[in-house]
């Protein structure tokens, strides 16, 4: 390959593009709220009501191809969670998935929540993924934590506990 046929890199940290296909005229491309935003806002393509204490799938009318070596994580938008008790569930977009992206919303409030066409309902965060070979072993190397599970490391800073001793 000669220098004439190489694709120019305009930035040192230039990443491969996120490819989006609109499935209808109501679809909107994901957008970032600021230059340093980690996620891309995902938009509803039609009105959907999420029942009180219930769940619902919100259509986006987009499909995508995430860059090689990444997956897409559908994450909550902080404003929806803080103001309306709306959370996002089950949101992994694998590199080989090409179907419509839908957003599973949980309504933890006592009133129905209406998602309007064009509302930002979640954010898409692209994360690098490492998929090593699975190897079964007879024993694992010991660690300081050991098998301690939920709550085993405590909730405080540990400073008070150290001062008591």
UniProtKB/Swiss-Prot annotation:
CDD domains: trimeric_dUTPase. InterPro entries: dUTPase, dUTPase-like, dUTPase-like_sf, dUTPase_trimeric. This enzyme is involved in nucleotide metabolism: it produces dUMP, the immediate precursor of thymidine nucleotides and it decreases the intracellular concentration of dUTP so that uracil cannot be incorporated into DNA. The keyword Protease does not apply. SUPFAM superfamilies: dUTPase-like. This is Deoxyuridine 5'-triphosphate nucleotidohydrolase. Its EC number is 3.6.1.23. One of its GO terms (molecular function) is dUTP diphosphatase activity. It catalyses: dUTP + H2O = dUMP + diphosphate + H(+). Belongs to the dUTPase family. It comes from Neurospora crassa (strain ATCC 24698 / 74-OR23-1A / CBS 708.71 / DSM 1257 / FGSC 987). Homotrimer. Pathway: Pyrimidine metabolism; dUMP biosynthesis; dUMP from dCTP (dUTP route): step 2/2. Its cofactor is Mg(2+). GO terms for biological process: dUMP biosynthetic process; dUTP catabolic process. Gene3D superfamilies: 2.70.40.10. It holds the Pfam family dUTPase.
């Amino acid at each position: 390959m000669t220098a004439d046929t190489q694709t120019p890199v305009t930035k040192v940290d230039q990443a491969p593009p996120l490819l989006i296909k609109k499935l209808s005229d109501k679809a909107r491309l994901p957008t970032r709220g600021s230059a340093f935003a980690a996620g891309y806002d995902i938009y509803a393509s039609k009105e959907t009501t999420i029942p009180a204490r219930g769940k619902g799938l919100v259509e986006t009318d987009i499909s995508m191809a995430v860059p090689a070596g990444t997956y897409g994580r559908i994450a909550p938008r902080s404003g929806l969670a803080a103001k309306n008790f709306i959370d996002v569930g089950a949101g992994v977009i694998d590199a080989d998935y090409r179907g419509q992206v839908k957003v599973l919303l949980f309504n933890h409030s006592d009133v129905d929540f209406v998602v309007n066409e064009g509302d930002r309902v979640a954010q898409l965060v692209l994360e690098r993924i490492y998929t090593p070979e699975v190897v079964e072993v007879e024993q694992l190397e010991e660690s300081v934590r050991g098998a301690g599970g939920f709550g085993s490391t405590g909730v405080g800073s540990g400073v008070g506990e150290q001062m008591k001793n």
